[in-house]
Amino acid sequence: MQIQCPDYILKAIDILKYNGHSAYAVGGCVRDSVMGRTPNDWDMTTSATPDEMKLAFDGYRIIPTGIKHGTLTVMIDSHPVEITTMRIDGSYSDSRHPESVSFTKKIEEDLSRRDFTVNAMAYSPETGLVDPFGGRLDTERKIIRCVGNPDKRFHEDALRILRAIRFASVLGFGIEEETAASIIKNRCLLNDISKERIRAELIKLLCGQNVEKVLLEFKQVIFEIIPELQATDGFLQHTPYHIYDVWTHIAKVTSSIESTSDLRVAALLHDIEKPSMFRLDEKGVGHFKGHPQKGAQTAEEILRRLRFSNAEIKHIATIIYLHDERPDGNRHHLAKLCAKFGIDNVDDTMKLIIADAHGKNPSIIEQEIQVAENARKQISEMRAENACLSIHALDINGNDIMALGIDRTQIKDTLDYLLDSVIDEKAENKKAALEKAAVNYINKK
């Protein structure tokens, strides 16, 4: 099999070969090439030690990115190329890093330490594809399979548990039976992994094309990371709007929404407090009053634990808080919602409402989708018009208010009143009109 490597990779291979070393493209770039995809990044492995690499690339900019494990980054024709010495890993004690590594000249030994067969392939123009573990066949069959014993692989680095289901989600692959069983068996090892690493893999997993299938098949892994979701599994909703239990509904909504990290995370957590807020009325119909508000609070706690940024937490929690809002077509009501919570947050809430509908009874969701889509059209019109949706967009400011003789303690209330007046079309967003409205407001208080 021939793979089209970029010129800068071929150049790196030629330089190492000229200096007496073997060199290969390796890992995900080879997998993607076998799949017919264009790789985002190209990594290499070589028989050269780090010191030998430095000699071979004399005159090139070299960054010692992982010198302890034999990794250098070499700038070749303005491209950063990560090159790692072929190695054999020693024992693992922290479920993440080998305690020691020993270098090897054999590509097969280096490939044997890798996580999955689809990532355990190497390529050079001289040798062609090097595939000692059947990675090409697994790639063609769309199967994620551990190299060697799955239990051993996951005990070496527990993050591989999440990586496996992330690859299944992103690539649309299935997971081989023995590997899948080991994932479930060893999921508790994820508790030894840093929250930052968990967060990064979880986001990639959630943004994958096959996320619904993965969330349903490997729900135990998700519950290990976010135990607060466990109660949603199998929880029946007892309402004609819902034909799925809460967890299945969550999986469908997550798959339906736009594939951005904040929206996918919001979808995952949006109904997390439905079980705790469930009430059955005298007719046997289920209700979940208050679950968005409580869910937003729980989401904040989870996201803080998983080391999301403050901006991400605020955005996601706001969307969850608002997701039971049902716009009635009244532009003034929608504009006030945008003024209070931010136009981007309200627009993203409408996206969640539309996805939410796709996780409900298909026979009765069309009206709900149409209402939210109409709201998004109105939001788009507001953007185009540069509609006044915050006090900062008013043609008057706090200094102007004080110049009218109004006490500084009344500034915020006055500006809020003026914004409402502009949104309700009771006042024009012009300074003179706003000054008059401000004076009238204070005089009536």
Where are these regions (language model features)?
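Catalytic cores of the polymerase beta-like nucleotidyltransferase superfamily
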Residues: 1-445
